[in-house]
């Protein structure tokens, strides 16, 4: 067959040669008669197999040129014949023959190659809303199901449509932005088998439908001459084809522009253009425009530069600089000011010498380019002596400026003196502002309101202070020798604020001659009166020397440097929800007594439940107590109600304040104070932790019994007086009480609580340290300072739970050797921080010092601190020189480290109680910590009605505001 084709081709060539030879004898052909060349074979398509020959002939009277196009690539041949001896798939394409007249004919050749069904050109680009051609033409037009398929079997988007052309490829219609990075294959069925082309990834160029987004870093700049000007312009668009530039109002400005571009996502192109003037000049001031445009349109944004030769400050008072305010009222002095560069120093000055800190300064706007500020001076409850000049001073690196307010305090007149002069004159001296007027009035008898005016003889005016802002003093006098009748003279001073009066009462009597007996009697009377006065003074002095009952716990209201301002406990509210009926209290034995009062064991019926009885401790005054002691006990009640409940303080349960003497009902702690508990347990102390011994089996909760025997045991509530002996209970039939875990819950029948006969070990001491630190952290969170933290002021109750207390009236400090006379007070000197001893400063940090002494007591099993050292001048000197106690016998090294940090001479270097809790928490066993955490969630008492408590405010040396309100309570 191939031989027959060659023979036919030979005849075709021969015919062509004959035409060429005879062409010269034929007439010329006009352009209108030109026809396209002829291609042999005369087909529009030709299918050959790979390896076969491709032979194409082009006939035309003139010269011809062959062009081969495949996958957008062109090849040319100037011969009339195009021959490919061994065809390949890449020879698939369109062959075009063009004559001299530009007319052409084409034939498309398919080179069928089973190994290469598709011709592929992998780069695939498409513009949004336009068509995109996937160049994967076929080499075999006879295959079926020619289409597109997603990679890895993934489906194509539902809205994707395409048109398949075996010669060109597959055209995706109306490309969308969502098609970006779409992976696909061309596919077809060949011989019943699906064939896939190489992978195509569609990259979509977004259609531009909006102008670029342009923004600058700041809308305006203010600079001093010589400073650098740098402004950043950010351009956002969907593609990088956006154009941008800076346009300067002053073309002479020398500026540099740096460009930085990047893509942030597929269709988010960003460009930064930073314009910089290294040293700005005044004539560089003006408008700078950042301009950007794309095919849709343009956008721009401007920034303004103002360059000044030097900085400035302009102050604008927001009120009249002359201010009148009444005595006791508040006034705010407000100024606004512009400053560039930023102000470095701002201050309010009183009378050009005294600084005041009751002011605040803040920017007028949060805008970065803001140069306007506001300063406010808050003057509260002004007194008459606080009038004067208040000056606001502000300065920056270049200039300073000020404005002065003249504040006048209007005060009600005050009668300073009213005297009878030797020359028969009555003189009245009054002071006030504005200038008071003094009028004189006369009335017969001893009336307190006179209406008959009397003209003054002499009136003098003087200023009561050096400055013109003080009270004005008026002297006025009248002659009373003209009055012939008994009566009253009123001196009445008044101004716009108010008035005040003083009265003179006088009577005219007959002259009486002295009697000879009168003088000795008068002398005797004067001597007796003098002696009585001396006796009264001595008794008063002794009374004042007597220690007064004072609430040790102090609640801090604010801190000014090293000065603590305490809340007056008498001003704290008392919620009558704490009231408990007196007739439901059944009093028992006295637990302890002091100079001012006593604590009595009692049974309260219906305190927790209506049908339940509970053993409580009731604090009350002695019948001989004075008013100050009664007020102090009420203050103690208010402080306890303010604090609220915590497991490690002696909590308030109720009170009786109506219908009789004040009674304060608190928790009853049956094991007494911790100091004597430690001393009792010295002989049975186990040096290692109890959990390491077999005795750990004894530590169990006993919840099946119905009554507590604690109240039946020997009373060891507290050491009220020296010399009281303590006897360890020895009932043979008592079971050993639970060490931890039998704490009373609100709705649970109380567990049996027996006298604690178990031994003491190191884990117990760590537990006591941890609990007391938790309790003190709670007090500190309520801004409460204890001032007398010691083992004697820690009580112990069921489950070896420690509770911090304030004995107050119930301790006989007069006979307690721990309290040393210092001035007219008795103080626990060995427990006090140096700043408390020498400067009478009590702070949260001084409580931390006392806690360190408490730890020493604890790990020495109740020894007295600074053993063998009397409190004398030598003791004070050693404390000043930094003497500290050595580690107690049973203290681990970590606990002694805590003691030493608590005894740091610098209060600010001492840890807080919260930090101490965290340090000790690392040393106690996990079981103890877990049990304590469970107990802390129990609330054994009725709800505390007090609300809105406070967290600890800043302590000594705090950098925060010097005066802070009480904040919302945070849990400890």
Curated annotation (Swiss-Prot):
- Annotated glycosylation sites: 94, 145, 283, 293, 300, 320, 352, 367, 400, 463, 486
GO terms under biological process: actin cytoskeleton organization; B cell differentiation; cell chemotaxis; cell migration; cytokine-mediated signaling pathway; detection of mechanical stimulus involved in sensory perception of sound; digestive tract development; embryonic hemopoiesis
Indicate the segments annotated as coiled coil, or none if absent.
Answer: none
All disulfide bonds of the chain are: 58-97, 136-186, 151-183, 233-290, 428-491
Enzyme Commission code: 2.7.10.1
Region Important for interaction with phosphotyrosine-binding proteins: what ranges? 564-566
Query: What's its membrane topology?
Result: Single-pass type I membrane protein
The source's superkingdom equals Eukaryota
UniProt entry keywords in alphabetical sequence: ATP-binding, Cell membrane, Disulfide bond, Glycoprotein, Immunoglobulin domain, Kinase, Magnesium, Membrane, Metal-binding, Nucleotide-binding, Phosphoprotein, Proto-oncogene, Receptor, Repeat, Signal, Transferase, Transmembrane, Transmembrane helix, Tyrosine-protein kinase, Ubl conjugation
**UniProt entry tagged with the keyword Coiled coil:** no
Under the heading PROSITE patterns, the entry gives: IG_LIKE (PS50835), PROTEIN_KINASE_ATP (PS00107), PROTEIN_KINASE_DOM (PS50011), PROTEIN_KINASE_TYR (PS00109), RECEPTOR_TYR_KIN_III (PS00240)
Transmembrane spans? 521-541
Q: Which residues carry this modification: Phosphotyrosine?
A: 543, 549, 564, 566, 699, 717, 726, 819, 896, 932
EC category name = transferase
Q: How is it modified after translation?
A: Ubiquitinated by SOCS6. KIT is rapidly ubiquitinated after autophosphorylation induced by KITLG/SCF binding, leading to internalization and degradation.
Query: Protein kinase domain: which residues?
Result: 585-933
Q: How does it assemble?
A: Monomer in the absence of bound KITLG/SCF. Homodimer in the presence of bound KITLG/SCF, forming a heterotetramer with two KITLG/SCF molecules. Interacts (via phosphorylated tyrosine residues) with the adapter proteins GRB2 and GRB7 (via SH2 domain), and SH2B2/APS. Interacts (via C-terminus) with MPDZ (via the tenth PDZ domain). Interacts (via phosphorylated tyrosine residues) with PIK3R1 and PIK3 catalytic subunit. Interacts (via phosphorylated tyrosine) with CRK (isoform Crk-II), FYN, SHC1 and MATK/CHK (via SH2 domain). Interacts with LYN and FES/FPS.
Anything else known: Numerous proteins are phosphorylated in response to KIT signaling, but it is not evident to determine which are directly phosphorylated by KIT under in vivo conditions.
Q: Which family does it belong to?
A: Belongs to the protein kinase superfamily. Tyr protein kinase family. CSF-1/PDGF receptor subfamily.
Q: What is this protein called?
A: Mast/stem cell growth factor receptor Kit
What is the source species?
Sus scrofa
Q: Which gene encodes it?
A: KIT
């Amino acid at each position: 067959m191939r031989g027959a084709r060659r023979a036919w081709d030979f005849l075709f060539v021969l015919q062509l040669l004959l035409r060429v030879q005879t062409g010269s004898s034929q007439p010329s052909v006009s352009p209108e008669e030109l026809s396209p060349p002829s291609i042999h074979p005369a087909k529009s398509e030709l299918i050959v197999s790979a390896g076969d020959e491709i032979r194409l002939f082009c006939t035309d009277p003139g010269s011809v040129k062959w062009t081969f196009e495949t996958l957008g690539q062109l090849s040319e041949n100037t011969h009339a014949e195009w021959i490919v001896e061994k065809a390949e798939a890449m020879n698939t394409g369109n062959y075009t023959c063009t004559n001299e007249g530009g007319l052409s004919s084409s034939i498309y050749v398919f080179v069928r190659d089973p190994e290469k069904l598709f011709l592929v050109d992998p780069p695939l680009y498409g513009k949004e809303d336009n068509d995109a051609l996937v160049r994967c033409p076929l080499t075999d037009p006879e295959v079926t199901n020619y289409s597109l398929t997603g990679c890895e079997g993934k489906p194509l988007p539902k809205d994707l449509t395409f048109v398949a052309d075996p010669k060109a490829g597959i055209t995706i219609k109306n490309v969308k932005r969502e098609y970006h990075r779409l992976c696909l294959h061309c596919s077809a069925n060949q011989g019943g088998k699906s064939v896939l082309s190489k992978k195509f990834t569609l990259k979509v160029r977004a259609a531009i439908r909006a102008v670029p987004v342009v923004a600058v870093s700041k809308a305006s700049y203010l600079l001093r001459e010589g400073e650098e000007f740098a402004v950043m312009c950010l351009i956002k668009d969907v593609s990088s084809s956006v154009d941008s530039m800076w346009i300067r109002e002053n073309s002479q400005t020398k500026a540099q522009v740096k460009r930085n571009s990047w893509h942030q996502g597929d269709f988010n192109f960003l460009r930064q253009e930073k314009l910089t003037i290294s040293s700005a000049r005044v004539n560089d001031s003006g408008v700078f425009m950042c301009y950007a445009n794309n095919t849709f349109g343009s956008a721009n944004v401007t920034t303004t530069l103002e360059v000044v030769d030097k900085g400035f400050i302009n102050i604008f008072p927001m009120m009249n600089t002359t201010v009148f305010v009444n005595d006791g009222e508040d006034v705010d002095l407000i100024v606004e000011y512009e400053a560039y560069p930023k102000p470095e120093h701002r201050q309010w000055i009183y009378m050009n010498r005294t600084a005041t800190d009751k002011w605040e300064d803040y920017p007028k706007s949060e805008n970065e380019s803001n140069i306007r500020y506001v300063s406010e001076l808050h003057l509260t409850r002004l007194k008459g002596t606080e009038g004067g000049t208040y000056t606001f001073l502000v300065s920056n690196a270049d200039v300073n400026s000020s404005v002065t307010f003249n504040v006048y305090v209007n005060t009600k007149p005050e009668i300073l003196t009213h005297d009878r002069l030797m020359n028969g004159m009555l003189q009245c001296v009054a002071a006030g502002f504005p200038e008071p007027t003094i009028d004189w009035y006369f009335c017969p008898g001893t009336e307190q309101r006179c209406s008959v005016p009397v003209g003054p003889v002499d009136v003098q005016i003087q200023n009561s202070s050096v400055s013109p802002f003080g009270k004005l003093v008026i002297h006025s006098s009248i002659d009373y020798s003209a009055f012939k009748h008994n009566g009253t003279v009123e001196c009445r001073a008044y101004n716009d604020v108010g008035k005040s009066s003083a009265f003179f009462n006088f009577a005219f009597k007959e002259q009486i001659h002295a009697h000879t007996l009168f003088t000795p009697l008068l002398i005797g009377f004067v001597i007796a009166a003098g002696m009585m006065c001396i006796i009264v003074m001595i008794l008063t002095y002794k009374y004042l020397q007597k220690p007064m009952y004072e609430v040790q716990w102090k609640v801090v209201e604010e801190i000014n440097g090293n000065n603590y301002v305490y809340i007056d406990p008498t001003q704290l509210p008392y919620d009558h929800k704490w009231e408990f009926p007196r007739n439901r209290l059944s009093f028992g034995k006295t637990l302890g007594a002091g100079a001012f009062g006593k604590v009595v064991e009692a049974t309260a019926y219906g305190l927790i439940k209506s049908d339940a009885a509970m053993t409580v401790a009731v604090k009350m005054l002695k019948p001989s107590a004075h008013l100050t002691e009664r007020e102090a006990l009420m203050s103690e009640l208010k402080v306890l109600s303010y604090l609220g409940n915590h497991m490690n303080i002696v909590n308030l349960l109720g009170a009786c304040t109506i219908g009789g003497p004040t009674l304060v009902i608190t928790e009853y702690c049956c094991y007494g104070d911790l100091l004597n508990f430690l001393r009792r347990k010295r002989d049975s102390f186990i040096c290692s932790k109890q959990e390491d011994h077999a005795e750990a089996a004894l530590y169990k909760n006993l919840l099946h019994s119905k009554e507590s025997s604690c109240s039946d045991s020997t009373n060891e509530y507290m050491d009220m007086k020296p010399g009281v002996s303590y006897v360890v209970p020895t009932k043979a039939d008592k079971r050993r009480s639970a060490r931890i875990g039998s704490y009373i819950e609100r709705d649970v029948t109380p567990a049996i609580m027996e006298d604690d006969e178990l031994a003491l070990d190191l884990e117990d001491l760590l537990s006591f340290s941890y609990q007391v630190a938790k309790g003190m952290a709670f007090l500190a969170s309520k801004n409460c300072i204890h001032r007398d933290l010691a083992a004697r002021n820690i009580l112990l109750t069921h489950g070896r739970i420690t509770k911090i207390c304030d004995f107050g009236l119930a301790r006989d400090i007069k006979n307690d050797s721990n309290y040393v006379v210092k001035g007219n007070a008795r103080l626990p000197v060995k427990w006090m921080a140096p700043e408390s001893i020498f400067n009478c400063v009590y702070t949260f940090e001084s409580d931390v010092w006392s806690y360190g002494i408490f730890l020493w007591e604890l790990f020495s099993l109740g020894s007295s601190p600074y053993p063998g050292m009397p409190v004398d001048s030598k003791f004070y000197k050693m404390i000043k020189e930094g003497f500290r106690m050595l580690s107690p016998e049973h203290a681990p090294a970590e606990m002694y480290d805590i003691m030493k940090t608590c005894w740091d001479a610098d209060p600010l270097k001492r840890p807080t109680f919260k930090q101490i809790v965290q340090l000790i928490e690392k040393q106690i066993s996990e079981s103890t910590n877990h049990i304590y955490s469970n107990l802390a969630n129990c609330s054994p008492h009725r709800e505390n009605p007090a609300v809105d408590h406070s967290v600890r405010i800043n302590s000594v040396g705090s950098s925060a505001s010097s005066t802070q309100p009480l904040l919302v309570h945070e849990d400890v």
